[in-house]
Amino acid sequence: FLAFLIIYYGLQSGFSIGFANPSILGVAQTMAEIPIFSGTNVRVVCCLANITFLYIVTMLYYRRIRKDPTKSLNYGSDFHSAFEVSSDKVDSKMTKRQILTAAVFLLGVVLCVGLTIACKWNAKKIASYFFGMMIVIGLVSGFSMNEISDKFIKGCKPMIYASFITGLASAIAVILNQGKVLDTIVYVLSIPLNQVGAVVGAGLMVVVNVIVNIFIPSGSGQAAVMIPLMTPIADLVGITRQVAVQAFQFGDGLCNLLTPLNGPMMGCLAMVGISFPKYIKWAFKYLMMNIGAAIVITMVLQAVGWVGF
């Protein structure tokens, strides 16, 4: 589970409320008709605060299990990890062939980054590139084509369960969206925004976006649903559009660590052998602290009339 915190929390700490995310923040600001990436100064501070908070959470867990390994979420768990870890000792000294293999791998990664930027590759092309790179690395390592195939299949086995969990979580969100269930949920949640003042309404916007994000984990998808609805309400109540966008960003980003419909998170939890109920029981208090701080910050920004440009 510590590996999950280091990798997934590390990723989300910068991405969830990132100040230069074109696919989420850029889209939301464009739809709200405010300058793209305006308000960067405040968002940089918020992003750094989020990184610091999740780093502290990770370190608290690390120190707890270092002092007492039985307090690990994995201890005594009957929910098995997707990966089998061997306890056999191996020779840590790298051979010349292994060094060559590592060099080819690093060169391949650098080449992939360059080609992705130059040729504007999408995810499918990148996946195809790495599939071909796997064959090259296998040959450099001295394996036959049959051995490469066997090792590839063996490597895919632990990912099947995680992929199934990821697909299932995403499918639920698709069903809610295609079934028009989300339209009703969003409408009901938006009603109280018209009944309160600007400062309280700004904080309430964060809460509404948190709830909506449980059903729409996609940031761009939530922006398409919420921004056209929130913008006229913000104008009516007296909330600045910059604050409305920030409320959306807080609600969308911070809730990604909370919703079971977040396919990538559920897949990562499956890989480390932690069930969602066990995870949320541990993480809930920290996530509520983070969301609570976001509500207060949003209300303060509205109180000072933040427009960001």
Where do the model's predicted regions map?
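Alpha-helical transmembrane segments of multipass membrane proteins
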Residues: 13-14, 46-54, 108-112, 209, ...
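Hydrophobic transmembrane alpha-helices that form the pore/transport pathway of multi-pass ion
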Residues: 1-32, 215-249, 272
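Transmembrane alpha-helical segments and their short flanking loops
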Residues: 18-45, 81, 235-243, 263-309
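Loop-to-transmembrane-helix entry motif
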Residues: 155-159, 163, 192-196, 247, ...
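Alpha-helical transmembrane segments of multi-pass membrane proteins
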Residues: 1-13, 39-43, 48, 198-213, ...
